[in-house]
Amino acid sequence: MPRSQRPEHRSPHRRHALPAAALAAFALVAACAGPPKTGDGGSGDQAYKLSADTPAAKGRLDSFSWAVYAEPPTLDYISAFDYPQNTILSNVCESLMRWTPQLTLAPGLAAKTTSPDPTTWVYDLRPDVHFHAGGVMTADDVVYSLGRQMNPDNAAAWAQQFQNVSTVTKSGPLQVTVKLKQPDSQFNQYMATAAGVVASKAGIEAAGKDYGTSGSLDCTGPYQLGSWNKGQSIQLRRFDAYWGAKAKSAKVDFRFLTDPSARVNAMISGEADGGYLIPTESYDRLSRSGVGTLYFGEGLSTVNVNVTDMKGVLGDVRVRKALSLALDRSGFVRTGLAGAGSATGSLTSRAAWAAAPPDVRKEAFEGLTPTAPDIDRAKALVKEAGATGKTVTVATSSIGQDVSLLATAVQSAGARIGLDVQLKTIAPNAFTALFTDAKAREGIDLFPETYYDSITDPLDLLANFKTGAYQNFAGHSDQAYDDLVDKATAAADPAERFTLEAQLQKTASDQLLWIPVAEWPTAVFLNKRITGAPTTISYMYYPWAADVGSAQ
């Protein structure tokens, strides 16, 4: 989904997608091969290296502390679409499937998954899995948990992932069968995200409207929710009845530090042992601090400019192309991302295409949006469109340089080609509303958005431009595009699906439905006391904190 506060995708619905094989369980891992294990950060001159992982923990801990940039408004899994929620929730609530640190698919609460026909998924559950409040997981809990995602009254962030679901039924004490309205190659992949979370039916019903904001989440993960000091911190406690490997730390303290400088100072002073989503302006400071290590990993993330209104000036594709041609992408990577990224003309990351045949992967990245500025051509397009002097409004925020400096870059680009680009400042704690509230987007034509895939498949992002899609804020509608999305979704064969997705990528590029800017890796800082956290975006859904232990 969009990441909202840290604009990314993951919105209520961020269509995150992984390659899936609707007909054969064996294809699950093969279809979503992860990105390269190590190496440079992509094409071009990179100032960073990708690490496959951090060193494994050598021992256990009594506790460790983790800095997060915002307090989650709720930890209800049906609303978990942004970084703060998922960073914490992934350690408490588990899904039917599991996204591994290598960004591949593995069994989760479902020990076995089969697809006897293109419109059926059967999940055989692990036995003797305990909820945090003491109950034992059954098929009834799964049916109830997925049902909450499908209930329109709940306005679930993941509702779009269930649009092709006809029924979810109990087919045995520890077996659940999902019937689809039509083949959906993506559905099972999303069962590794918060869309596939299983919580106790009894626990949710007992909590009522307070579920997710106080008391137990009554899930099955290696940690259970401890204290929640509103506005300050959340503490997780190790769940000793966990069905899998026990967490290495007895406690985890998540500290809400909204100010970027305060967050970095906490990591350097030891107040926080580590954190994800490191402010880009602090990469160098942390790297040279001597108190720990800054790692970069595959983020399946692209930094884009989300076009939210096509009824005004930006309704003319020539104006969108002009802004794109005037953008200094390389300059933004140097300043906004501190050199840790690469300019791109693709809305999707290269790693999202890891499982595609080489020729299809090559085709997907040929002839896309130019990344080098062409001011003369951009000026001509603005003039042709009769848009000279017209106003375009872009949202900005101090939430991070990836937002503020990109907004400034858009303003500068507009000024160079005859557009009047105005900045509208949004408070960091209100930025998420751009993804959830149409009123918050009123008067805004564009905003910076870092989109991360929730599954290892480009359709996760490209499906956002289908008519009625959650993140289709501009209301783009193209029947031919919609038909291609449907065909790609239904394609069980990965080669066929990626071929269709390459066509979608070309259309999205030609129309500049969003303006692509850069690929951006995940960053994680660990001080010398701890190690074991994954370097990849997997931490959004994988119980990463359970792997963190003593470095000595």
Labelled PLM ranges:
Residues 114, 122-124, 160-203, 227:
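Surface-exposed binding/hinge segments that line
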Residues 192-246, 251:
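Gly/Pro-rich hinge or "lid" segments in bacterial periplasmic/extracellular proteins
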Residues 239-285:
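Ligand-site clamp/hinge motif
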Residues 4, 65-116, 147, 218-219:
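N-terminal lobe/hinge region of extracytoplasmic solute-binding protein
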Residues 111-155, 177, 313-316:
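Aromatic- and charge-enriched surface segment that lines or borders ligand/interaction sites
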Residues 237-240, 299-322, 326, 335:
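A bilobed periplasmic-binding-protein/Venus flytrap-type ligand-binding module shared by bacterial periplasmic
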Residues 317-412:
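Append "and occasionally in soluble cytosolic enzymes with long acidic Gly/Pro-rich linkers
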Residues 28, 34, 229, 327-356, ...:
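Detector for C-terminal structural segments
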